[in-house]
Amino acid sequence: MERVGEHPVPVGPLAVRWLACEVEESRAGVTSRARLRLENAGSAPWRSRGREGVQLAYHWLDPLGNPIVWDGIRAPLPRVVEPGEAVELDVTVAAPRPPGSYRLVFDLVEELRFWFQEVGSAPLDLPVEVRPRISERRLGVVLHGKPDAETEAALVAQEERLVSENALALAHLVPGALPAPDWSRLLLDGHEEGYAAVGGAVEIVARSDRRRYAAWTPGGGRNPRLGQPLLLPSLLDGLEPGRHEDLPAFSGSDALFEGRAVVRLRPRSGRPSG
């Protein structure tokens, strides 16, 4: 751990002296670990009571100090920390979206009552560069069905070239799915921003099917709370698609609907016609 420099420590019942810290690399939308050593520099003991009492937590602020995430994940104390005693704590840190420059501010909180900073104690304020979730923009495609000449032509025409090896994200399509030229770029943008699953809009050719797929109609923006599974999703390593409306789909959190990434779907494209 790296030693923390000198900082103001108030006189009173509740005061923290930050001694050392170690923070793992932060990637957008991903949890990592931090380890901190701190001393009870006040006159009152610190006690955790399950999810209540004194907890170690954090805020994410922008470079100007505006809160981005105020209530970070809590870490309870392993024991009562008496005045003058030190303790080491491991903290799970969930990085914000999108990547960029942030301030990661650790503080103690008396749960449901106050943060120690509010009663005069100094928090630990660290500059952190949150990196993109994916280290490289490498998108591959899995075709669920027989080869299709039109689908292949649409994939070759992508603005951002697809890869056949060492993909960091895999998009799941069906024969007759025709992604727009900017589709691959928009999916990779979503992964880079911090989402494990990114799915686009579906433009249905068959009129009889349009009501069935109305929730995925093109023309919308970006929505991390669509309320429906993503269709024809792009998924990071470790995720597998399910099925919804007879298409590859993803249901779960950590997902973004990218309404500008449009896939035109011919009739009978891997599903029964309505």
Question: Across the structure, where does each feature detected by a protein language model lie?
Answer:
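Low-complexity, acidic Ser/Thr/Pro/Gly-rich terminal tails and inter-domain linkers that flank the onset
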Residues: 2-28, 125
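Short beta-strand and strand-turn-strand segments in soluble, beta-rich domains
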Residues: 14-18, 57-77
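Short, surface-exposed loop/turn segments at beta-strand-coil junctions that are enriched for proline
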Residues: 92-100
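N-proximal low-complexity "stem/linker" segments adjacent to membrane-targeting elements
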Residues: 131-158
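Short beta-strand-to-loop acidic/aromatic patch adjacent to the donor-nucleotide binding site
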Residues: 165-180
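Conserved donor NDP-sugar-binding/catalytic core segment of glycosyltransferases
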Residues: 178-217
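Short, flexible, basic/aromatic active-site loop/helix in glycosyltransferases
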Residues: 201, 217-248
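Donor nucleotide-sugar recognition loop
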Residues: 245-252, 262-274
